[in-house]
Amino acid sequence: MVDNTQWFKRCVGSWSSQRRYIYGNSSEPDNITTYFSMTQTADDSFCLAWGSDRNSGEMNFVIDGDVVHRDIGYYSSAPTDSQMETIDEDTIVFHTTYGGITYREEIRLLLDDNVRLRQTIGTRNGKVNVVGQYYEVREDVSD
């Protein structure tokens, strides 16, 4: 079994994120810059805090084998579990369902763990609800 906690440890630090979203049938992309930081709070626990000109928040989560237990979801204030799929040592895919939408989120670490390429697709009843593309750059490393 892969120790998924190690992948999250590689993400600890402060990041800037250039994000592009397309919702439903909209042809207009929504671009946003978000800043986030990840800290390790225990051997298998982490905290993700984010902020932008539109919103801010904090999510705490625990790694349990190939499951992530989050205290909130990205689009929900309720606790959420995600199934993790390890593609290779640099890439993890999260599979999550809540609010009637199924999400597939892939994150790949690049350039000595200083860049993250991320993409998300959310579907409902076989139709695309949201697509997100993210270019994330490490700003500094937390201890």
Give each language-model segment a name:
Residues 1-14:
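N-terminal helix-cap/turn-to-beta initiation motif at the start of protein domains
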Residues 25-103:
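Central antiparallel beta-sheet cores of small beta-barrel/beta-sandwich binding domains
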Residues 89, 112-116, 124:
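Intrinsically disordered, low-complexity linker/loop segments enriched in Gly/Pro
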Residues 108-109, 119-143:
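Edge beta-strand at a domain terminus
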Residues 4-5, 17-47, 129-132, 139-141:
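Short, solvent-exposed loop/hinge segments that bridge or flank secondary-structure elements
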Residues 95, 101-107, 113, 117:
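Acidic and generally charged, gly/proline-rich low-complexity regions
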Residues 47-49, 117-120:
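Hydrophobic core segments of beta-strands in well-ordered, beta-rich domains
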Residues 13-19, 116-118:
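A short, Trp-centered hydrophobic/proline-enriched beta-strand micro-motif
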